[in-house]
């Protein structure tokens, strides 16, 4: 019997939905954006731990805590038969019963709380904290907050794992940049800035999840996704499963991968997910340039870090990309390129045939499985009750939820877009009309990738539990064109002191496998808002959802007094919105995306990956957009006023020689370009009457080096907590050498001699000029692309 037939026999029960290659009816994944996963792939299983005291493995090296993790994992895998080896290459692995190795599920989710956990129906382990979606959390510009959230998720995840209800690897964070305003999953990301925001988010989230920077005992394993060039779902019928994105080496280096460099080199992430799409003709999961040359050889991915495919993307190497000649070839191409574990069943079902046809070796398959189990060793999977985190219980879930960080993330991230002084509400306001499809929501507060929360506070809940008299009317639905609810809404508004409308978009319009085709307010929400604005009452609009919509009509309507963006604010979202509106908390969030005018979505195809303006493309992101945004990236108002000033004496160094910078000692930094060029220090004074946090973005610009030049780019950000009126505080934003480099056409990061500016926020409230002298120099060398795997 051939190896392929032997494995097929073993996997009959394991893979009930697997396809045979003789089957000629396949889903057209060039159009369909949802993979047809087998029941085995999506299964959640009851997890347990190997018995290293009395079980079959107890006398083997894998149970020897004094041995190196790699050696322990290699010793384990060497005991597998070939069939057992192949069986354990998928996300749902059956383990090896004869060795006492339990089944394991790689696929757990932790985007903003636990998902794909085995929650109970009630009582202990029936919920976990549900934080705001990442795009709202990033708008707080608070690195510590991101790390706190990830740390809590990891604590709760380990508590669930200790009772077999959650895995030790999580498919998070999503650190793709939110390039296209129509992308359905932009809500999952830290925004449109890749170099600074996505990289900072990656670092803080990964180190929070993993328990530090490459700790000896990992808390959980984070997975940086989706690598690389993934930022569309199904725009205009272009499926994410079949997209082939044309990206220059310049923009691949500059925009689509710097966050993955930071994840690998600095945060020491232990897992990376290759994406569905192809880039320049090569599917990401069969792209040896991505997975070996860049990730391992250039970015410094940890030695036993493993690459997981996105779910079914190894299969997609054949269908629909047709990079491989058949499914067997897709499995072989993916493992040889560097995809270690298949989220799916392609490896499990087709490695036997690939082995028989000498397309793959046992050593190549072993390499990936050893990497996975090496991480499980680091996670204490084989250490029994001696594992560092084995004592975490349900009490730790309850305790960490009580820290109320979910509320803090929501209230810090909320962005005040417009305000004429109506907010915070005057003490004299007694009655409020609450209107709109986002006012009485539950799970909608959570966005996507969520599990059950301990509670969900809608805006309506929060106001009903306050001292206000509430007049509620639904008004209209997100995408409705029916005006049946208008009269009730207008009636509620007329008998109230203040009108609050909550609407925008939700996951019926933006989601995984679903992009938008426009960026307008859907349905007849604007029509209802316009009628409400004619009543002569103060009107506050809450614009909800992850992606932006064109709110220019609300911005220009003087009868719309205030406009707030609230994202997907999580379990405490309604309370956070109430507290901002009433002034219990002051807003300080800033947009981490650009709000474009509606016509932007019609000017060029969303599949155009070039950020630089060309043809009908007016440029993408705040760095290159040549039009006039409705609200800029970085926009955000306060309830008070601030004054920023440079505290220096005028003697600070403003000229730097490039060669001197790159030849200086750099203790504490792996690379000289990570050294601070300077520290941008400003004094911030609250000149108003309201205590408030203060947030800042620091931008650089220059005309040094070759054209075209970006408008500006972000080099740093920070947040000061609760600055009282008439008080001052110092803020320091380090500016690294690399952050003022530009990317040349070959993808190299280059320092160019010339004049540079650093400007604080869009208002340019403080500007610092400096000069780089000497010869231009490469600070980061981008490798020449060479593929080890060729197309069939």
From Swiss-Prot:
It is found in: Secreted. Xylan 1,4-beta-xylosidase involved in the hydrolysis of xylan, a major structural heterogeneous polysaccharide found in plant biomass representing the second most abundant polysaccharide in the biosphere, after cellulose. Keywords: Carbohydrate metabolism, Glycoprotein, Glycosidase, Hydrolase, Polysaccharide degradation, Secreted, Signal, Xylan degradation. Belongs to the glycosyl hydrolase 3 family. GO terms for molecular function: alpha-L-arabinofuranosidase activity; xylan 1,4-beta-xylosidase activity. GO terms for biological process: arabinan catabolic process; xylan catabolic process. It comes from Aspergillus fumigatus (strain ATCC MYA-4609 / CBS 101355 / FGSC A1100 / Af293). The active site is at 310. Pathway: Glycan degradation; xylan degradation. One of its GO terms (cellular component) is extracellular region. It catalyses: Hydrolysis of (1->4)-beta-D-xylans, to remove successive D-xylose residues from the non-reducing termini. It comes from the Eukaryota. Residues 1-20 form the signal peptide. This is Probable exo-1,4-beta-xylosidase xlnD. Gene3D superfamilies: Glycoside hydrolase family 3 C-terminal domain (3.40.50.1700), Glycoside hydrolase, family 3, N-terminal domain (3.20.20.300), Immunoglobulins (2.60.40.10). Glycans are attached at residues 23, 87, 118, 142, 246, 326, 385, 404, 440, 477, 518, 679, 701. Its EC number is 3.2.1.37. Coiled coil: none annotated.
């Amino acid at each position: 019997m051939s190896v392929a037939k032997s494995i097929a026999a073993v996997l009959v029960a394991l893979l009930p939905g697997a396809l045979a290659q003789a089957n000629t009816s396949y889903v057209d994944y060039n159009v369909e954006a949802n993979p047809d996963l087998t029941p085995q792939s999506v299964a959640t299983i009851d997890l347990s731990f190997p018995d290293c005291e009395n079980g079959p493995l107890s006398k083997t090296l894998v149970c020897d805590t004094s041995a190196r993790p790699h050696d322990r994992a290699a010793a384990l895998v060497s005991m597998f038969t070939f069939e057992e080896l192949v069986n354990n290459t998928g996300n749902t692995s059956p383990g090896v019963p004869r060795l006492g190795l339990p089944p394991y599920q790689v696929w757990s989710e932790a985007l903003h709380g636990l998902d794909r956990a085995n929650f109970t129906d009630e009582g202990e382990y029936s919920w976990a904290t549900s934080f705001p979606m990442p795009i709202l959390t990033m708008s707080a510009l608070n690195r510590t907050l991101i790390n706190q959230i990830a740390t809590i998720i990891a604590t709760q995840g380990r508590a669930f794992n200790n009772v077999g209800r959650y895995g030790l690897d999580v498919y998070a964070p999503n650190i793709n940049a939110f390039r296209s305003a129509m992308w359905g999953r932009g809500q999952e990301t830290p925004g449109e800035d890749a170099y600074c925001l996505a990289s900072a988010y990656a670092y803080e989230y990964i180190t929070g999840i993993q328990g530090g920077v490459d700790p000896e005992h990992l808390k959980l394993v984070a997975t940086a996704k989706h690598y690389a060039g993934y930022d569309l779902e199904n725009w205009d019928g272009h499926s994410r499963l079949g997209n082939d994105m044309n990206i220059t080496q310049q923009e691949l280096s500059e925009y689509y991968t710097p966050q993955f460099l930071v994840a690998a080199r600095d945060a020491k992430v232990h897992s990376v997910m290759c994406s569905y799409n192809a880039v320049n003709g090569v599917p990401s999961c069969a792209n040896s340039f991505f997975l070996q040359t860049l990730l391992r050889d250039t970015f410094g991915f940890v030695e036993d870090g493993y690459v997981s495919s996105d779910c079914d993307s190894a299969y997609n190497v054949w269908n629909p990309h047709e990079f491989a000649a058949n499914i067997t070839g897709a499995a072989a191409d993916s493992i040889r390129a560097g995809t270690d574990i298949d989220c799916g069943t392609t490896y499990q079902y087709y490695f036997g045939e690939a082995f028989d046809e000498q397309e793959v070796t046992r050593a190549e398959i072993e390499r990936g499985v050893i990497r996975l189990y090496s991480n499980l060793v680091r996670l204490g999977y084989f250490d029994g009750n001696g594992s560092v985190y084995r004592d975490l219980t349900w009490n730790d879930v309850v305790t960490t939820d009580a820290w109320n960080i979910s509320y803090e993330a929501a209230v810090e991230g909320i962005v005040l877009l417009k305000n004429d002084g109506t907010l915070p509400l005057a003490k004299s306001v007694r009655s409020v009309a609450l209107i709109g499809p986002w006012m009485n929501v539950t799970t909608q507060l959570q966005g996507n990738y969520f599990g059950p929360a301990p509670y969900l506070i809608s805006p309506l809940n929060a106001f009903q539990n306050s001292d206000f008299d509430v007049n509620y009317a639904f008004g209209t639905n997100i995408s409705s064109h029916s005006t049946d609810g208008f009269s009730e809404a207008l009636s509620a508004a007329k008998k109230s002191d203040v009108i609050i409308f909550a609407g925008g978009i939700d996951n019926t319009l933006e989601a995984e496998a679903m992009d938008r085709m426009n960026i307008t307010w859907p349905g007849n929400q604007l029509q209802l808002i316009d009628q409400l604005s004619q009543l002569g009452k103060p009107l506050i609009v809450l614009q909800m959802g992850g992606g932006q919509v064109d709110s220019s009509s609300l911005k220009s309507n003087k009868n719309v007094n205030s406009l707030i963006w609230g994202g997907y604010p999580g379990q405490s979202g309604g309370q956070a919105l109430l507290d901002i509106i009433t002034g219990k908390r002051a807003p300080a969030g800033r947009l981490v995306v650009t709000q474009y005018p509606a016509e932007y979505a019609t000017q060029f195809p969303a599949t155009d990956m070039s950020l630089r303006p060309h043809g009908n493309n007016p440029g993408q992101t705040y760095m290159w957009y040549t039009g006039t945004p409705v609200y800029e990236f970085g926009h955000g108002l306060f309830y008070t006023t601030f004054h920023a000033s440079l505290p220096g004496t005028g003697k600070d160094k403003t000229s730097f020689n490039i060669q001197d910078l790159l030849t200086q000692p750099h203790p504490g930094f792996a690379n000289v370009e990570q050294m601070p060029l300077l520290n941008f220090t400003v004094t911030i004074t609250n000149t108003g009457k309201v205590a408030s946090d203060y947030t800042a973005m620091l931008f650089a610009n220059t005309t040094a080096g070759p054209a075209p030049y970006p408008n500006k780019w972000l080099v740093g950000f920070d947040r000061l907590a609760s600055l009282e009126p008439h008080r001052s505080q110092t803020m320091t934003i380090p500016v690294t050498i690399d952050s003022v480099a530009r990317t040349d056409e070959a993808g190299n990061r280059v320092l160019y001699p010339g004049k540079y500016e650093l400007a604080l926020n869009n208002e340019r409230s403080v500007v610092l000029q400096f000069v780089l002298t000497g010869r231009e120099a490469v600070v980061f060398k981008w490798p020449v692309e060479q593929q080890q795997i060729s197309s069939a």
